From Swiss-Prot:
InterPro entries noted in UniProt: SRP1_TIP1, Yeast_SRP1/TIP1_CWP
Gene that specifies this protein: PAU8
Alphabetical list of Pfam families matching this protein: SRP1_TIP1
GO molecular function: structural constituent of cell wall
Lineage: superkingdom: Eukaryota
Name the record gives this protein: Seripauperin-8
Similarity comment: Belongs to the SRP1/TIP1 family. Seripauperin subfamily.
UniProt keyword Signal, yes or no: yes
Length: 120
């Protein structure tokens, strides 16, 4: 006969090895911060490409917080709180390399953090 403590220990071991997941709305600020973190990293890695895009599309503006985060190489996540979800979506999806570069990187970062999104 299996002891109750053995069952409890087995359940605890399984729970400890399973990665925690959270399902959030796409507009949740935690999702936006992950997206913006990827976006800022991509801007840093491809700055010339973003400058060329901005020159070709002068009406596409960025919040000052994004510009500050790009050039501040410390912890920038607190700078990015409060940017409206629709503005985050507009910025990220508005560049031609969204599907090829940003979307896969964002999906990977969300998955790594155990975050899955649902449509609003």
């Amino acid at each position: 006969m299996v002891k109750l403590t053995s069952i409890a220990a087995g359940v605890a071991a399984i729970a400890a090895t399973a990665s925690a997941t959270t399902t959030l709305a796409q507009s949740d600020e935690r999702v936006n911060l992950v997206e913006l973190g990827v976006y800022v990293s991509d801007i840093r890695a491809h700055l010339a490409q973003y400058y060329m895009f901005q020159a070709a599309h002068p009406t596409e503006t960025y919040p000052v917080e994004v510009a500050e985060a790009v050039f501040n190489y410390g912890d920038f996540t607190t700078m990015l709180t409060g940017i409206a979800p629709d503005q985050v979506t507009r910025m990220i999806t508005g560049v031609p390399w969204y599907s090829s570069r940003l979307k896969p990187a964002i999906s990977s970062a969300l998955s790594k953090d155990g975050i899955y999104t649902i449509a609003n």
